[in-house]
Amino acid sequence: MQLTLFCFVCLLPGHLALPLSQEAGDVSAHQWEQAQNYLRKFYPHDSKTKKVNSLVDNLKEMQKFFGLPMTGKLSPYIMEIMQKPRCGVPDVAEYSLMPNSPKWHSRIVTYRIVSYTSDLPRIVVDQIVKKALRMWSMQIPLNFKRVSWGTADIIIGFARRDHGDSFPFDGPGNTLGHAFAPGPGLGGDAHFDKDEYWTDGEDAGVNFLFAATHEFGHSLGLSHSSVPGTVMYPTYQRDYSEDFSLTKDDIAGIQKLYGKRNTL
């Protein structure tokens, strides 16, 4: 099967940039080059027809997703959105399921943590992973079981640069992590960039609990939401409180896939 990858990312390396055009608006040539790569990555086709769009149409798709006037022109504010750390899946409206709605069919999904960050004690990473998975399992008839060796449905780890899955990390900033849709092999696995500064709720660095909860949403089969403030919103904010929870939109999406958990 074809694997679907999702990741937190800020900017992508530029290539094949077009000459500065009218659509560039009030931005520099370098920013226009960055914007082209961003649009090709996150808005490659029309959300309804699935046809490949021009860059102008891609930009309008982005503006529509974020509730902005669909001018088809860049602005400093749009560039600001593009430069926020985020997950690397193309954007869609409200909650969305991945193509073909992949999901886990067993009621017990195993996970294994194979590598750690030096920023947090291992026991803290273990606790955060457990807490992030529990946020989802509290809403659906699915349970997670940790294994210490051998194979597991979801392999979780921290890695640098090229780490064997054809999606290398890029050092501090930009890409923060990525996860694969449910399935065999790499399916469901969640990787985090070891070069980031991972924290347990500090102001600086990346809040690992929030990032893990977001990525595990992808590991379960969710795509992105256009609703600001949701866990599955594509851009990463640094002001999430430690007592955040899944929103109604997040819950609606995951229950669309798995149904509601019986609390009786």
UniProtKB/Swiss-Prot annotation:
Annotated compartments: Secreted, Extracellular space, Extracellular matrix
InterPro entries documented for this protein: M10A_MMP, MetalloPept_cat_dom_sf, Pept_M10_metallopeptidase, Pept_M10A, Pept_M10A_Zn_BS, Peptidase_Metallo, Peptidoglycan-bd-like, PGBD-like_sf
SUPFAM superfamilies, sorted: Metalloproteases ('zincins'), catalytic domain (SSF55486), PGBD-like (SSF47090)
Entry cofactors: Ca(2+); Zn(2+)
Signal peptide, first to last residue: 1-17
Keyword terms, alphabetized: Calcium, Collagen degradation, Extracellular matrix, Hydrolase, Metal-binding, Metalloprotease, Protease, Secreted, Signal, Zinc, Zymogen
Binding site for Ca(2+) 2: D170, G171, G173, T175, D193, E196
Motif (Cysteine switch): 85-92
Any GO molecular function: peptidase activity
Propeptide residue interval(s): 18-94
Domain notes: The conserved cysteine present in the cysteine-switch motif binds the catalytic zinc ion, thus inhibiting the enzyme. The dissociation of the cysteine from the zinc ion upon the activation-peptide release activates the enzyme.
Family statement drawn from the similarity comment of this UniProt entry: Belongs to the peptidase M10A family.
Protein name, as recorded: Matrilysin
Organism: Mus musculus
Chain's gene name: Mmp7
